[in-house]
């Protein structure tokens, strides 16, 4: 009780003191895949690139997720069912977490993982949060768009976007990214602190993100914003030690 009183005195007005941490998704979650994850995007197999997700392209071994893109021919239907309905050129992989992430005055979240991300033209891997209902919010913790950069992005609208680029190695070595999401004292906006390899990179803000449920998605999309033509061979995007913790009162 004394500890609670001290923390309550230190808490910002309009927020709750954070005294507990709960593991929402443990770092070894891929070893219990069906407990924590579903295949594909929350809305299905297609999105805004030329990759269509397939179960055979989602591989888990030794607590490491591998999403594999391979060229495909004669896809049916031949174009994506999602806007802008690009032609399908690849079979690939995506997963999403069963648990939604909802930042409130009482609950902050830390979302992290280690990734071996391809950076070749036409490869578009991502590790991101997006709205369960409507859009935005969107927070891109990892997004690689055919260059040796990771993009940290926060979308407040389609035109109000904050992006910070950091160098990303091209040798497919694993590196960590992390986002810490905390409600602001106005109980409307969310502060997002981004890290790479445990080094703080930048703070961005999500306007009106408090109370908005978000999906966590890991996917290997192709072409689209990463350019074209994409690779003629196999592309692999790996993830490990993906973890989500919730801190609350």
Curated annotation (Swiss-Prot):
PTM remark: N-glycosylated.
EC nos: 3.2.1.181
GO function terms (MF aspect): hydrolase activity, hydrolyzing O-glycosyl compounds
Alphabetically ordered keywords of this record: Glycoprotein, Glycosidase, Hydrolase, Signal
Temperature dependence per UniProt: Optimum temperature is 50 degrees Celsius.
Catalytic center residues: 138 (nucleophile), 143 (proton donor)
Transmembrane segments: none
Record flagged with keyword Oxidoreductase: no
Catalyzed reaction equations: The enzyme specifically hydrolyzes beta-1,3-galactan and beta-1,3-galactooligosaccharides
Presence of keyword Glycoprotein: yes
Gene3D superfamilies linked to this entry: 2.60.120.200
SUPFAM superfamilies, per database record: Concanavalin A-like lectins/glucanases (SSF49899)
pH dependence: Optimum pH is 4.0-6.0.
InterPro entries membership: ConA-like_dom_sf, GH16
Cleavable signal peptide: 1-21
The organism's place on the tree of life at top rank: Eukaryota
One GO BP annotation of this record: carbohydrate metabolic process
Domain GH16: 34-247
Residues modified by glycosylation: 48, 156
Class of enzymatic activity (EC top level): hydrolase
Family recorded in the similarity comment: Belongs to the glycosyl hydrolase 16 family.
Biological role: Specifically hydrolyzes beta-1,3-galactan in an endo-fashion. Requires at least 3 contiguous beta-1,3-residues.
Name of this chain's protein: Galactan endo-beta-1,3-galactanase
Organism: Flammulina velutipes
